[in-house]
UniProtKB/Swiss-Prot annotation:
PROSITE patterns: RIBOSOMAL_S6. The gene is rpsF. It comes from Escherichia coli O17:K52:H18 (strain UMN026 / ExPEC). Keywords: Acetylation, Ribonucleoprotein, Ribosomal protein, RNA-binding, rRNA-binding. Belongs to the bacterial ribosomal protein bS6 family. GO terms for cellular component: cytosolic small ribosomal subunit. This is Small ribosomal subunit protein bS6.
Length: 131
C-alpha cells in the first residue's frame, strides 16, 4: 500500500457535516485495511482567493496508507459531493505522523497566550500582596 496526503475543503455552510464526512472517509480507508497516520481538522479558514464567491472554507488534512482502489473511491466521492469545494490527493514516500505546521503554530499561539495569562495573574497576585 502507498502513502497519501489528502486535503479537502468543505463549504462553510456545511461545516456541521464535516465530522460525519471524516467518519465515512476513515471507515472506507480502514475497511480496506488501510491506516490513518494523521488526521487534522483545521476548521474554518480564510481562502487565499475566492472560490465560487466564497472567502472561507473548512479544511481537513489526512495522511493515510491505503490501496489505490480506496483512493480512487475517495476522489470520486469528493468530486460528486457538493459540499466539498476543493480536494487534493498527493502520493508521499513515507508516512507522515508529526503535527503539521498549521497545528504547531496554533499550539505555539495557545502556549504563548497561556504564558501571558499566567504572568498577568502572577503580577496581579504580587500587587495584592504588597499592599
Amino acid at each position: 500500500m502507498r502513502h497519501y496526503e489528502i486535503v479537502f475543503m468543505v463549504h462553510p455552510d456545511q461545516s456541521e457535516q464535516v465530522p460525519g464526512m471524516i467518519e465515512r472517509y476513515t471507515a472506507a480507508i480502514t475497511g480496506a485495511e488501510g491506516k490513518i497516520h494523521r488526521l487534522e481538522d483545521w476548521g474554518r479558514r480564510q481562502l487565499a482567493y475566492p472560490i465560487n464567491k466564497l472567502h472561507k472554507a473548512h479544511y481537513v488534512l489526512m495522511n493515510v496508507e491505503a490501496p489505490q482502489e480506496v483512493i480512487d473511491e475517495l476522489e470520486t466521492t469528493f468530486r460528486f459531493n457538493d459540499a466539498v469545494i476543493r480536494s487534493m490527493v498527493m502520493r508521499t514516500k513515507h508516512a507522515v505522523t508529526e503535527a503539521s505546521p498549521m497545528v504547531k503554530a496554533k499550539d505555539e499561539r495557545r502556549e504563548r497566550r497561556d504564558d501571558f495569562a499566567n504572568e498577568t495573574t502572577d503580577d496581579a497576585e504580587a500587587g495584592d500582596s504588597e499592599e
